[in-house]
Amino acid sequence: MTTLQTNKDPHLRGVSPNPSKIPVLSQRCQDFSSVKSRSLDQENQDPRTPAQKPPRSTQRQRPLTDTAGLRSKTLHQTEKSPSLKTLRNPLEELKPSSGGSNVGLVTHPQTEAIGAIEFVADPAALATILSGEGVKSCPQGYRSSLAQRVLVRERKGGTTQRGQSARSSAYLAPRIPTHQVGPARASCFSRLEGPGLRDHTLSPPRLEALNPPPGSSHSSTRPSLQELRRETCGGGRDGDCTDRRTSASQASRLLLKTPVQPASLPLRGEQEAVPHSDDGGGRHHLGLAQRIPLKESLTNTRSTYSSMKRFAIRRKAQFTPLRSLPKVQQAQWLSGLSPHSSPEEPALPWRQIAMKLFDQESRITLQKEPRKPSVASTSGPRPKRTPSHQELRIQRINILQQLLQQEVEGLAMGDGAPLNGGSAFDMTELKLPTAEISRTLTASEHNSGAALVGLSQHSGATEPLLSEECEEPQAYPEETKAAQPCSTTELKPPVPHRAEPELPEPCLPALSGPPLPSCRGQAEPPMACPRTEPGASAACALEAGTPESSTQPCCNQGPPATASLTFSSQSPVCASPSIHSLYPTGYSGPSSLAPRTLALRQRLRACLDTIHSFQEAHLDDECAFYTSRAPPPGPTRVFTNPVVTTLEWQDALRFVPIGPVVPQDSPS
């Protein structure tokens, strides 16, 4: 029946906008409910099919609940109340008028419905809504603000009298998205566009609390107030539209005052309003609410998204710092060679670790090899080995170079009796070797460089060379005598020296043998070591016995170890006896300088021998390679072209040092 009446009403709707203007004010409460149902029906149904308007009353009664269930209830109610239907007709008129005019309560509805000019005010109302004033306006399409908005679009449709139908169609369009949104989620697409935030909208109770001044809403505030009224009327299932109008106006004011509150507003009103806006039954409500909240939601959404962005940014900032902190810590750990390795930056840390490990190994070797020399050479720095490997290397190299230069100068100044044929070395030879040694030291800083430094500092390193060169164990006993002044570190190295002969690379084991603390403890200057620790003589004597075997094997191993330059160069250095000889310089030389010069000569000789042996081994390898390689090219070629053969020989025997004999044969 209501449907039939609503069908009959269309002419009233179209014609009644004028009379509905005034009645809207007086009847809005009653019409409000009826209009709710109508607007709901219209929104739910095509505006052109007003027969379905009975749901209007249904939605009108329970706009906040599920539109489907509410519709059934409202259908029953619509059947029960034909008066509501009659009211609905004027309400419909008022509704179009209210939709058409911002002054839904005033007589403008006709003009608004007739002309879209008055709807221009609606844009302002919509703007206010967007600003957040009436954003909350519940999805009650019956409200004049909603109707106005709808009418504006309706105007766009180009229908004035049928604006309601157009409105309902417009509502339908928006309500489709609204339907997509859960009714419980978005009460009127509450100001907060976000689905989670939509629920936080003004609640009818709050609006009612704001109600006290009835009729407080008018043209300027109507859009928002009407929306609020919709919320209040929709939220409250009572038909008191006036109270809710006032509450809506107040709510709109509150919204204007606090546009951001919706998120914090109680969810009850939102939920109630949600059914109107979200319910399929309250689709027209939803459409209206959607439009308004959608527009308003833009601002709300902005704020919401901004907050979301803030959260995201904060999260990123928090997590990123956490990650970065571990990275830094890991980098620090890596710098400290801690077991922890940075997963994000493995390459650099591992490289550094590898470098450090090698450095540490070199240190250990150097400490153990030149433990004694290191004591003298890095007397200050040794205890500080913690400093940096590079610094220690540089210091050692510098000290070694200085010592070598001083010793060479001393040799030039005073011809010290050459130990073990030390005279064989001319000063020029010494100078050249010193330059070579300095170069080699610079080349291999931590390996041979540090060892040479220790040896030069302790001058004992020369003794192993001397013993190797002269193969005179007596020199070691002498060294032991002189070694008595040597530091206990010398004593410790002797043991490693003993071990050295056993190991193919005795230097490394010997180095490992001497404890670092002893070296550090013996960090005293080379001169101080002999002075401070005369008790080392026993160890030196032991070394004297072992040095022969140890130093000789070191030297022997050095040349054979030519495959690895560092080892060959280190082996002479490794020989701890050389260290002993350094401080026992007094025994060998007529003067303190003489023993040093002799030790230096011995060291230089050993170093040079090792270097030469290494080079020779390489040359031998190259010669063997080239020689073995030369024969195949001839047989492979069927025709022996003299030019080709010569070229092949040149290519194969291009090695100049080896070539002189073979190239002569090869051209032939």
From Swiss-Prot:
Record-listed Phosphoserine modification sites: S16, S97, S169, S306, S324, S338
Keywords: Cell adhesion, Cytoplasm, Phosphoprotein
Region (Disordered): 1-102, 154-177, 189-285, 364-392, 462-502
Intracellular or extracellular location(s): Cytoplasm
Highest taxon of the lineage: Eukaryota
Any one GO cellular component localisation term in the record: cytoplasm
Predominant localisation class: cytoplasm
Subunit structure: Directly binds bystin, and indirectly trophinin.
Function: Could be involved with bystin and trophinin in a cell adhesion molecule complex that mediates an initial attachment of the blastocyst to uterine epithelial cells at the time of the embryo implantation.
Name of this chain's protein: Tastin
Species in which this protein is naturally found: Mus musculus (Mouse)
